[in-house]
């Protein structure tokens, strides 16, 4: 992502700065009533730290935008997948509001063009650069919410974010393989699958669990995940697919 070079001042008295927001307003199809919200949304904390006259950066708007984003995503997925469990909805939500996807949207909208970034931070690469872009999308959502209200912010989010929910990989995330395996096992083997914890690894804040699932002594598979439930789902998926393929 290409970020705009640091300007001497983010003052809205700067004609170039005002013109840039008119350009952004036209690009995203939202009329800005209070440009100061958007000005703040595009001031990174590193720029504020290097310019004492700047009173506020975009971190508070980022916090607000993250909450609005989460609500819109949760409500939309709740309506889209009426049979999905809480765990399944959480998994797909975490994917569509993840840093890589938010970064992709920021890239698509070229939000870095409007960002005031400190000299030191401009040299960041890789994950640091992607995180800045993702946070920028959240701060823009926060500004839209304050300026135009929830409905406009929701429309903007749905337009640019929830298209990712239509991705086949997302559809796959909400398939309940435990239920499918259980129903198949009862019908064809007259018994229920048996799950067992095989182990866990990693630090307390980032554990990986291993679970095995067996049907009689005939079929067995293992799965891994950040929680026991996810590991069970992955094990069930592995065994279900294996059984259906006949090996």
Swiss-Prot record:
<dbReference type="Pfam" id="PF00035">
    <property type="entry name" value="dsrm"/>
</dbReference>
<keyword id="KW-0694">RNA-binding</keyword>
<dbReference type="GO" id="GO:0006397">
    <property type="term" value="P:mRNA processing"/>
</dbReference>
<keyword id="KW-0963">Cytoplasm</keyword>
<protein>
    <recommendedName>
        <fullName>Ribonuclease 3</fullName>
        <ecNumber>3.1.26.3</ecNumber>
    </recommendedName>
</protein>
<keyword id="KW-0507">mRNA processing</keyword>
<feature type="domain" description="RNase III">
    <location>
        <begin position="21"/>
        <end position="149"/>
    </location>
</feature>
<dbReference type="GO" id="GO:0005737">
    <property type="term" value="C:cytoplasm"/>
</dbReference>
<keyword id="KW-0479">Metal-binding</keyword>
<keyword id="KW-0255">Endonuclease</keyword>
<keyword id="KW-0540">Nuclease</keyword>
<dbReference type="GO" id="GO:0006364">
    <property type="term" value="P:rRNA processing"/>
</dbReference>
<dbReference type="GO" id="GO:0003725">
    <property type="term" value="F:double-stranded RNA binding"/>
</dbReference>
<keyword id="KW-0698">rRNA processing</keyword>
<keyword id="KW-0699">rRNA-binding</keyword>
<feature type="active site">
    <location>
        <position position="66"/>
    </location>
</feature>
<dbReference type="InterPro" id="IPR014720">
    <property type="entry name" value="dsRBD_dom"/>
</dbReference>
<dbReference type="InterPro" id="IPR011907">
    <property type="entry name" value="RNase_III"/>
</dbReference>
<comment type="similarity">
    <text>Belongs to the ribonuclease III family.</text>
</comment>
<dbReference type="GO" id="GO:0019843">
    <property type="term" value="F:rRNA binding"/>
</dbReference>
<keyword id="KW-0378">Hydrolase</keyword>
<comment type="subunit">
    <text>Homodimer.</text>
</comment>
<dbReference type="GO" id="GO:0046872">
    <property type="term" value="F:metal ion binding"/>
</dbReference>
<feature type="binding site">
    <location>
        <position position="138"/>
    </location>
    <ligand>
        <name>Mg(2+)</name>
    </ligand>
</feature>
<dbReference type="Pfam" id="PF14622">
    <property type="entry name" value="Ribonucleas_3_3"/>
</dbReference>
<feature type="binding site">
    <location>
        <position position="135"/>
    </location>
    <ligand>
        <name>Mg(2+)</name>
    </ligand>
</feature>
<feature type="domain" description="DRBM">
    <location>
        <begin position="176"/>
        <end position="245"/>
    </location>
</feature>
<dbReference type="InterPro" id="IPR000999">
    <property type="entry name" value="RNase_III_dom"/>
</dbReference>
<feature type="binding site">
    <location>
        <position position="62"/>
    </location>
    <ligand>
        <name>Mg(2+)</name>
    </ligand>
</feature>
<feature type="active site">
    <location>
        <position position="138"/>
    </location>
</feature>
<keyword id="KW-0819">tRNA processing</keyword>
<dbReference type="GO" id="GO:0010468">
    <property type="term" value="P:regulation of gene expression"/>
</dbReference>
<dbReference type="GO" id="GO:0004525">
    <property type="term" value="F:ribonuclease III activity"/>
</dbReference>
<keyword id="KW-0460">Magnesium</keyword>
<comment type="function">
    <text>Digests double-stranded RNA. Involved in the processing of primary rRNA transcript to yield the immediate precursors to the large and small rRNAs (23S and 16S). Processes some mRNAs, and tRNAs when they are encoded in the rRNA operon. Processes pre-crRNA and tracrRNA of type II CRISPR loci if present in the organism.</text>
</comment>
<dbReference type="InterPro" id="IPR036389">
    <property type="entry name" value="RNase_III_sf"/>
</dbReference>
<dbReference type="GO" id="GO:0008033">
    <property type="term" value="P:tRNA processing"/>
</dbReference>
């Amino acid at each position: 992502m290409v970020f705009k070079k640091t300007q001497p001042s983010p003052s809205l008295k700067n004609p170039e700065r005002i013109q840039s927001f008119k350009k952004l307003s036209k690009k995203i199809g939202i009329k800005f009533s209070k440009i100061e919200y958007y000005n703040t949304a595009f001031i990174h904390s590193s720029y504020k730290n290097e310019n004492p006259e700047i009173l506020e950066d975009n971190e508070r708007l980022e916090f607000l935008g993250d909450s609005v984003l989460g609500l819109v995503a949760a409500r939309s997925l709740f309506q889209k997948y009426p049979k999905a469990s809480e765990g399944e909805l959480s998994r797909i939500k975490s994917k569509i509001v993840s840093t890589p996807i938010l970064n992709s949207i920021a890239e698509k909208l070229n939000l870095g063009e409007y960002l005031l970034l400190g000299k030191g931070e401009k040299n960041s690469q890789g994950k640091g650069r992607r995180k800045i872009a993702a946070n920028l999308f959240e701060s823009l959502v926060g500004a839209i919410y304050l300026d135009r209200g929830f409905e406009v912010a929701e429309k903007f989010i749905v337009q640019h974010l929830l298209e990712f929910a239509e991705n086949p990989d997302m559809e796959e995330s909400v398939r309940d393989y435990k239920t499918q395996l259980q129903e198949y096992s009862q019908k064809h083997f007259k018994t229920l699958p048996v799950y067992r914890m095989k182990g866990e690894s990693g630090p307390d804040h980032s554990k990986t669990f291993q679970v095995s699932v067996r049907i009689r002594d005939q079929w067995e598979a293992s799965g891994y995940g950040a929680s026991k439930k996810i590991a069970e789902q992955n094990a069930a998926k592995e065994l279900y697919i294996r059984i259906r393929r006949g090996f």
